[in-house]
Regions:
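C-terminal PAP-associated
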Residues: 21-496
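Hydrophobic h-region of N-terminal signal peptides that target proteins for export
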Residues: 11-20
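Bacterial N-terminal signal peptides that target proteins for export
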Residues: 1-8
Length: 496
């Protein structure tokens, strides 16, 4: 759809601000703001240090292009760790954006992901919700959703997409589009992808995908799991949450154990828990869903740093695939209310029996005086060292007195029982997705998306790569861009 068919930016921001402030429907699809754009034109502190302080490298602008980008993901090739691939949403354009680096994250190139033909007269479509995984053959698999709509006629449907790159993420010639669902109350949301990269696994290079098949909160919704044994050419699909449950679930993530075990965790909105299921036959069959932990925030929360989009609650999990003492241990993380009932904090739990039981939730971030929010965590277990790494947004450096400003912080644990303190600051400059030096609303901020729904982290052989939405350059003059301002960018940093 051409820019001339969309609203001018001033009208866009006023529309998004009003709709965000008045929207009390917590189950609006997370890509709704992007759709609207196109349609209209605490507790006890973390324990002491577990290792020396990490060394954080330079902050690198990965996207470096017009318009806002948000909602980031990153992965790497375990057989060539300098080959890294990432992705993000493109807010003012229709396709997804892919990023690749062949030098360990020092420099990056970008590419658009394929979209299918639109449906109907004057129809169009767009992509959202990036997730990526390498297999052991060097293929990159990039999953996302496609949302179809007719101009002025509402949503025509959604479907899943998995694109494959054979050159490290530089190009994605085609994609497999599947699981189409039609109707405004039926949509596929929040796909996450994983690959079995265990060299001795009987399911090596299987591709796994999870998402929530939302259906207006009816029992026909629920968490879907798809498996591919032919490198993404085809997928078989099963439901892995309670098939008799209310179907009010979101943000499932698949992850793989050291012997090819398949795990998935998600936010059970109705039960207000972080839920879990497992498969020991390569994703063919699953057991009965169980609970990792109860929580206080059911779906999302409007904290000052992300008050318009609101911070989604989701699990980020991984398994120890190293040969170390905790091989096979599972780790999960999530955001929830701090003990003061006001701020948000990051929690983790682990399991040594393949998810049959879990440890009591443990805080990750430093205990600080004052009011501090933490949100949008991502957890990655180093498959070589077994160390557990986590990154998250944190408002501890806010100078507005309103918890508007964020930085990305990082922590590390050898076993998930104690976390590196003090946490390490990753960002060299803070972001503010609320105002621009006190000016509110600000045309340099995409209020409908702000930080998106998550950020990313990947760790391997003692090195971690964090990726996030960054607005430090939001007011920089960018001639020829829609707002003539840089707005949100995708940044990354290497942590050793």
């Amino acid at each position: 759809m051409s820019f001339s068919n969309r609203l001018v930016i001033a009208a866009l921001f006023s529309t998004v601000l009003v709709s965000a402030q008045n929207n009390n429907n917590s189950f609006t699809p997370r890509w709704w703001a992007k759709y609207q754009t196109l349609l209209q034109n605490g507790a006890g502190g973390a324990a002491g240090p577990t290792s020396s302080a990490p060394a954080v490298g330079a902050n690198v602008d990965v996207s470096n292009e017009c318009g806002p980008q948000s909602e980031t993901f990153i992965t790497l090739n375990t057989l060539n760790a300098k080959s890294i691939a990432g992705g993000s949403n493109e807010i003012f354009r229709d396709p997804m954006r892919g990023y690749s680096s062949s030098d360990g994250g020092a420099t990056w190139t970008g590419v658009d992901l394929p979209l299918p033909p639109a449906i109907g007269t004057n129809g169009t479509d767009f992509g959202s919700d990036p997730s990526l995984a390498f297999d052991t053959r060097g293929n990159v698999f990039y999953s996302y959703i496609v949302v179809f709509f007719g101009h002025g006629n509402g949503i025509n449907g959604t479907e899943l997409a998995v694109a494959r790159s054979t050159d490290g993420g530089k190009t994605y010639p085609s994609a497999n589009f599947f699981s189409f669902s039609s109707g405004s109350n039926h949509f596929n949301d929040k796909p996450m992808i994983a690959a079995d990269t265990n060299l001795n696994s009987p399911f090596r290079d299987n591709i796994y995908l999870t998402w929530d098949a939302a259906s207006g909160g009816s029992t026909s919704g629920g968490i879907r799991f798809a498996r591919s044994t032919d490198h993404g050419a085809s997928f078989s699909i099963v439901r892995i949450d309670n098939p008799k449950g209310p179907g009010r679930v979101i943000a499932a993530q698949p992850f793989v154990g050291p012997n090819g075990e398949v795990y998935a965790a998600w936010n059970d909105i109705a039960a207000n828990t972080i839920a879990f299921n497992s498969s020991f036959d390569g994703g063919v069959t699953f057991g009965t869903p169980s609970v990792i932990a109860s929580k206080s925030i059911a779906f999302d929360i409007g904290i000052p740093a992300i008050s318009f989009r609101r911070a989604l609650i989701y699990p980020s999990c991984d398994a120890d695939r190293s040969s170390g003492p905790h091989q096979g241990r599972l780790y999960c993380s999530w955001t929830d209310l701090a003990s003061n009932g006001v701020n948000t904090d990051i929690f983790t739990a682990f399991s040594d029996n393949k998810g049959s039981s879990w440890s009591a939730p443990q805080r990750v971030a430093d205990s600080l005086s004052g009011s501090v929010d933490r949100f949008y965590q991502w957890l990655s277990v180093d498959a070589v060292t077994g160390e557990v790494n986590i990154s998250f947004y944190d408002t501890r450096n806010d100078t507005t007195g309103q918890r508007f400003m964020t930085d990305v912080y990082f922590s590390r644990s050898s076993d998930g029982t104690s976390w590196l303190s003090p946490n390490s600051r990753v960002t060299t400059a803070s972001s503010n997705e609320h105002d621009c030096n006190g000016v509110f609303p600000c045309s340099a901020i995409d209020y409908g998306n702000q930080y998106g729904d998550y950020e990313g982290l990947v760790s391997f052989n003692g090195i971690s790569h964090a990726i996030w939405t960054d607005s430090r350059d939001q007011l920089n003059f960018a001639p020829g861009c829609r707002t003539n301002l840089a707005m949100e960018e995708v940044f990354t940093a290497t942590i050793r």
